[in-house]
C-alpha cells in the first residue's frame, strides 16, 4: 500500500533545509574567499608564466629587478593599510574616553554653577543688608560704603556671567568691564581724600574674607570654564584687598609726624664736621664752653676694629686742639694785661695767630690749665701716648710746688740785693710786645714737649729733651754764680756778668724774680724713649761742656774782679772797643762781639741765655749729613775755647758762624 506524505513531513524537510542553508552560508563565504585567493594566485602564476615566457624571449636579468620591486611594493602597501587601521582603532578608543570624561566634568560644572549662583545671591543679600540706612550708627564711613557698593556690583556681574545664557562670552569683555569698574571706584576715592577717616582693620578683613570664602568652591575647577571663573574671583579679591592696603598706606603716610620729616632733612644735609663746629664756637664764647668742648671725646669710645688705626690720629688732633686752646688763652690774657698796665721789661713773645681770638676770663683759663690734658680715655692703639700724659700731670704738680718755694726764696733775695743783668743777645729787628711777667712765667714754665711726637719725629724729640736738660743744668750754674757775685758785691763794687754786646742800644731791666723763676723751672722731667738712646750720649757730652763753660765763666769773673781791685783796667778797655769815657770805677765789661751795625730792639736776658746755652746741633741730622757733623762739633769746640781764651776778632767770627748754624737748624729742621 502506498502511504501519502502528510503536511508534517513537508514542514520538517523545510526546517532541515533552512538549517542546512544557514550552516553552509559561512562555508560558502569561506569558499568564496578561498576562490578569490586562488584567483589571485592564479593571476600571479599567470603573470609569472607570462613573464617567464617573456623572459625567455628577452633577457631574464632585466626583468628580475622589476619583479622584485613590484613584489616589495605590494607588501609595503598591505602593511601600511594594516597600520592605519590599527591607529584609527586606537584613536577611536581615546576619543571615547575623552568624551566620557568631558561629560562627567560638564555635569560637575553644572552643579558648581548652581552652588556659585546660590553663594553670590547670599553675598549680595548680605551686602545689601550692610548698606541699608536703617542703622546709621553702625555705618563705618563713606569710603567703606563705596567699597561695599563696588562689591555688590561685582557680585551682580558675577551672577550674570555664571548664568547659562552668558557662559559663551569671551574673557576679554569681562576684563574690560572689570577694569572700567575699578577705575570708576578709584575716582571718587581720590576726590574725597580730605574727608577720609581711619577705617577699622577688622571691617576690611571681614569683607575680604567673606568675598574669598563665598567664591571658594571655584578654586578646584580645572577645565576652561574653571579658569574663567577663578579669574573673575581673583579680580574681585584683588580689588578689595588692594584698595584696603592702598588706603592703609595713605593713612600711614599722613600719620607720619613733622618732626621725623625735619630729622630727615637734617640727615640729608649731612653731619657737621667737628672742626667746623669748633671754628663756629671759637668766636665770642666763654671759656667754660671751651672747657666742655675740649674735655668731650670727639670719637666714641667703642669703635669698630677696622677703625682702630685711625683712633690714634683723632686723639692726637684732640690733644693738639687742647694745647692750642691753652696757648691762645695765654697769649690773649697777656695782651689784655699789656693794655691795662705797663710792663717793667719786655720778654720774648711768640704770636701764635694773626686774627683776634675771643676774650676769655681768667677763672676759665685757670680751670683749663688745671684740667688734666690726658683725661680722655685712649684706645689700646694709643697706649704709648698715655704714659706721656701721666708724666705731664706729675710734672704739673711738681712745678706748682717748685714755683712756690722759688717765689719765697726770691722774695728774700729781692729785699737784700738788686737784680743783675744777664748775658744778652738781640735776635730780632722789630720791637716785641710787652707782656706781664706772671703770664710769661706761666708760659715758660709749661713743658715745651707737651704733645708726644709720633715715631717719625723721634730724632727731634730727643733734641728737645736734651735742651730741657741743658736748661736745668744752666739754671743751677747761674744760681751758684749769682750767690758768688752777691758775696763779692757786698765786699766791692758791683761787676756785671759775662756779656756780649751786639748793638749799642741800652737793654731794659727785668724783674729778677721772674727770670729766676723761668731758669729754675725743671722742664726736663720727661724721660727719653729707647729710640733716642744713640742721641742721648752726644747731648750729655754737650751738657758737660756747658757745665764746664759755666764754671770757667765763674772763674774768669773772679779773676776779673781781682784785676779790677789791683787797677788792671787797660787790657779790659781794649776789649770793650767802643765804650769810652766812663767813670773812675766803671763796671768790668764782658766778652762781646759786634755782628751788625743796624739798631735792633732789645731782648730780655733770659731768652739770650737760653739761646747761648743751646747747642748748634739742635736738630739731629739724618745719615746723609754725616760729613757735616764733624764741622758742627768743631764749631762747638771753638765756641768753648774762645770763651776761655778771649780774642775779640776770632770770637766775633765764631759767634757769627754759630748764630747762622742755629738759624739754619731752626728754619730747615729736616
Swiss-Prot record:
Residues 180-201, 242-295, 558-588 are annotated as: Disordered. Keywords: Coiled coil, Cytoplasm, Repeat. Residues 70-130 form a coiled coil. The keyword Transmembrane does not apply. Its main location: cytoplasm. InterPro entries: NBPF, Olduvai_dom. Residues 165-257, 258-329, 330-421, 424-479, 480-572, 573-670 form the Olduvai domain. Residues 259-268, 279-291 have a biased composition (Acidic residues). One of its GO terms (cellular component) is cytoplasm. Ubiquitously expressed with a higher expression observed in breast and liver. Also expressed in neuroblastoma cell line. It comes from the Eukaryota. Encoded by one of the numerous copies of NBPF genes clustered in the p36, p12 and q21 region of the chromosome 1. Belongs to the NBPF family. This is NBPF family member NBPF15. It comes from Homo sapiens (Human).
Amino acid at each position: 500500500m502506498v502511504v501519502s506524505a502528510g503536511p508534517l513531513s513537508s514542514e520538517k524537510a523545510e526546517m532541515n533545509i533552512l538549517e542546512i542553508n544557514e550552516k553552509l552560508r559561512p562555508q560558502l563565504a569561506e569558499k568564496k574567499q578561498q576562490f578569490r585567493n586562488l584567483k589571485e594566485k592564479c593571476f600571479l602564476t599567470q603573470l609569472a608564466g607570462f613573464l617567464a615566457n617573456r623572459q625567455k624571449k628577452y633577457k631574464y636579468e632585466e626583468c628580475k629587478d622589476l619583479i622584485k620591486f613590484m613584489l616589495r611594493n605590494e607588501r609595503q602597501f598591505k602593511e601600511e593599510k594594516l597600520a592605519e587601521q590599527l591607529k584609527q582603532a586606537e584613536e577611536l578608543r581615546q576619543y571615547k574616553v575623552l568624551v566620557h570624561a568631558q561629560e562627567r566634568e560638564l555635569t560637575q560644572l553644572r552643579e558648581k554653577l548652581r552652588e556659585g549662583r546660590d553663594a553670590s545671591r547670599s553675598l549680595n543679600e548680605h551686602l545689601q543688608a550692610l548698606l541699608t540706612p536703617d542703622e546709621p550708627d553702625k555705618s563705618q564711613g563713606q569710603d567703606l560704603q563705596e567699597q561695599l557698593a563696588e562689591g555688590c556690583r561685582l557680585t551682580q556681574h558675577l551672577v550674570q556671567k555664571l548664568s547659562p545664557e552668558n557662559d559663551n562670552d569671551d574673557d576679554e569683555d569681562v576684563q574690560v568691564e572689570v577694569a572700567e569698574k575699578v577705575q570708576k571706584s578709584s575716582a571718587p576715592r581720590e576726590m574725597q581724600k580730605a574727608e577720609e577717616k581711619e577705617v577699622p582693620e577688622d571691617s576690611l578683613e571681614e569683607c575680604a574674607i567673606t568675598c574669598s570664602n563665598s567664591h571658594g568652591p571655584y578654586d578646584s575647577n580645572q577645565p576652561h570654564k574653571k579658569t574663567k571663573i577663578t579669574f573673575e574671583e581673583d579680580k574681585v579679591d584683588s580689588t578689595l584687598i588692594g584698595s584696603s592696603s592702598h588706603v592703609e598706606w595713605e593713612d600711614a603716610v599722613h600719620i607720619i609726624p613733622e618732626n621725623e620729616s625735619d630729622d630727615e632733612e637734617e640727615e640729608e644735609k649731612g653731619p657737621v664736621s667737628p672742626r667746623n663746629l669748633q671754628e663756629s664756637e671759637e668766636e665770642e664764647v666763654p671759656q667754660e664752653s671751651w672747657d666742655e668742648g675740649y674735655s668731650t671725646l670727639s670719637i666714641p669710645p667703642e669703635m669698630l676694629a677696622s677703625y682702630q688705626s685711625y683712633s690714634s690720629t683723632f686723639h692726637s688732633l684732640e690733644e693738639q686742639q687742647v694745647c692750642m686752646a691753652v696757648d691762645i688763652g695765654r697769649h690773649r690774657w697777656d695782651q689784655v694785661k699789656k693794655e691795662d698796665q705797663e710792663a717793667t721789661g719786655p720778654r720774648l713773645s711768640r704770636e701764635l695767630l694773626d686774627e683776634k681770638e675771643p676774650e676769655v676770663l681768667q677763672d676759665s683759663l685757670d680751670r683749663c690749665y688745671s684740667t688734666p690734658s690726658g683725661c680722655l680715655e685712649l684706645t689700646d692703639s694709643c697706649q704709648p701716648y698715655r704714659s706721656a700724659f701721666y708724666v705731664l700731670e706729675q710734672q704739673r704738680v711738681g712745678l706748682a710746688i717748685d714755683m712756690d718755694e722759688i717765689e719765697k726764696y726770691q722774695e728774700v733775695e729781692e729785699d737784700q740785693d738788686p737784680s743783675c743783668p744777664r748775658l744778652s743777645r738781640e735776635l730780632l729787628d722789630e720791637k716785641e710786645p710787652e707782656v706781664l711777667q706772671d703770664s710769661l712765667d706761666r708760659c715758660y714754665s709749661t713743658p715745651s714737649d707737651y704733645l708726644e711726637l709720633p715715631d717719625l719725629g723721634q730724632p727731634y724729640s730727643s733734641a728737645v729733651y736734651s735742651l730741657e736738660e741743658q736748661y736745668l743744668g744752666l739754671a743751677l750754674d747761674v744760681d751758684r754764680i749769682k750767690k758768688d757775685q752777691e758775696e763779692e758785691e757786698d765786699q766791692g763794687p758791683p761787676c756785671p756778668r759775662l756779656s756780649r754786646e751786639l748793638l749799642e742800644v741800652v737793654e731794659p731791666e727785668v724783674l729778677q724774680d721772674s727770670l729766676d723763676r723761668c731758669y729754675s723751672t725743671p722742664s726736663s722731667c720727661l724721660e727719653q724713649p729707647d729710640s733716642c738712646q744713640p742721641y742721648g750720649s752726644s747731648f750729655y757730652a754737650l751738657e758737660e761742656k756747658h757745665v764746664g763753660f759755666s764754671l770757667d765763666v765763674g772763674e774768669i769773673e773772679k779773676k776779673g774782679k781781682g784785676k779790677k781791685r789791683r787797677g788792671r783796667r787797660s787790657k779790659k778797655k781794649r776789649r770793650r772797643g767802643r765804650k769810652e769815657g766812663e767813670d773812675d770805677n766803671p763796671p768790668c765789661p764782658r766778652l762781646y762781639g759786634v755782628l751788625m751795625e743796624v739798631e735792633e730792639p732789645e731782648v730780655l736776658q733770659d731768652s739770650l741765655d737760653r739761646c747761648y746755652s743751646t747747642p748748634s746741633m739742635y736738630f739731629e741730622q739724618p745719615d746723609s749729613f754725616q760729613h757735616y757733623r764733624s764741622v758742627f762739633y768743631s764749631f762747638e769746640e771753638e765756641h768753648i775755647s774762645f770763651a776761655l781764651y778771649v780774642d775779640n776778632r776770632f770770637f766775633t767770627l765764631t759767634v757769627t758762624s754759630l748764630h747762622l748754624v742755629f738759624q739754619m737748624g731752626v728754619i730747615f729742621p729736616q
